[in-house]
Amino acid sequence: MKFIGKLLVYLLVALLIVILALYILLQTRWGATQVSSWVTVNTDYELSFDKMNHRFSSPSHIILENVTFGRDGKPASLVAKKVDIGLSSRQITDPLHMDTITLFDGTLNLSPQTAPLPFQADRLQLNNMAFNSPNTEWDLSAQKVTGGVSPWQPEAGNVLGNHAQIQMSAGSLTLNGVPATNVLIEGQLNGKEVVLNTIGADMARGSLTGSALRNADGSWIIDTMRLNEIRLQSDKTLTAFFAPLTTIPSLQIGRLDVTDARLQGPDWAVTDLDLSLRNLTLSKGDWQSQEGRLSMNASEFIYGSLHLFDPILNAEFSPQGMALRQFTSRWEGGMVRTSGNWLRDGKALVLDDVAIAGLEYTLPQNWKTLWMAPLPEWLNSVTLQKF
């Protein structure tokens, strides 16, 4: 019996020595190479890292250094200087579901070709990371990203998952060709619905703040949005500039405020624009509104040969049409003032009062052609009540 007892003790000591040796070896470059090779050979993924660290002061955390991870034959999904993996008792029943995963100083590629990833976490934390998501609905590139996704449950075609809370900031970001800096985003992913509770960014030498919702069908609801001191030059015509609004099912605007904006494109420009828009929905080339309002003024507005100085416009929207409360502007050395209504039923513009003073205007050479040109689709007739 004593012999069996001593044998068991020796075996236990030997086992502990082997475990300790493995523990030490795994934290060497040789151990990192062996683990990387095993994952690459025996799974559909490629993994490489230089070193694994573990400290008894943080027994539930494993740190990998200089990590590259991705699917076989595909671009790497993850490149990071350091990956901190937080473990919990959940690994007993679900080994690939971590408590936390923290990525430091690297790049996370969100392309559908790199998904799905085989692991999940209660929280994915990013520190000074870069995002890339080419060839997706949201063509995104971001640098110096810090923030978190909770929970993180990546799926095929959606590396962030379908249900998560998001809090992120980025030093710079380009979304569908639009650049911004000092970006802050807080929101949720609910299936194909995206809730943006807080949006903040510096863009076009100005700033943007607001909150919005993207529905599953691709339509947008803007609760609030404010643009301050935007300075934007575009190579697009005015029609092409607003063309993206026609590509989505609908855009519902609760409140939009623009302050001191300067916009310019080929053959059009507006300077010192102040705009306030309430309760308007754009859909399929038309609009709907219930108690909507528009107030707008600028120092200068140019569209083709039309050149207005100090234009002021105030209007109200309803299901019946638009009530033009005020339009005044300096034009061609004179002053123009009018008010009236545009009626949806019949597409008729009825101007209650039109006043023109001090006008010095020379008709263009093609004025007859312009006079005979058909009216736009939204206008069938014009009536002047008083001139």
Regions picked out by a protein language model, each given a short descriptive name:
Residues 6-10, 22-24, 57-58, 155-158, ...:
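Short hydrophobic/aromatic-rich motifs at helix boundaries and adjacent loops
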Residues 19-112, 175-180:
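Terminal hydrophobic membrane-targeting helix
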Residues 42, 46-51, 143-155, 180-186, ...:
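Short small/polar-residue motifs
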Residues 56, 87-91, 153, 212-216, ...:
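Short, low-complexity Ser/Thr-rich regulatory SLiMs
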Residues 66-159, 215-251, 263-279, 363-376:
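Secondary-structure transition motifs
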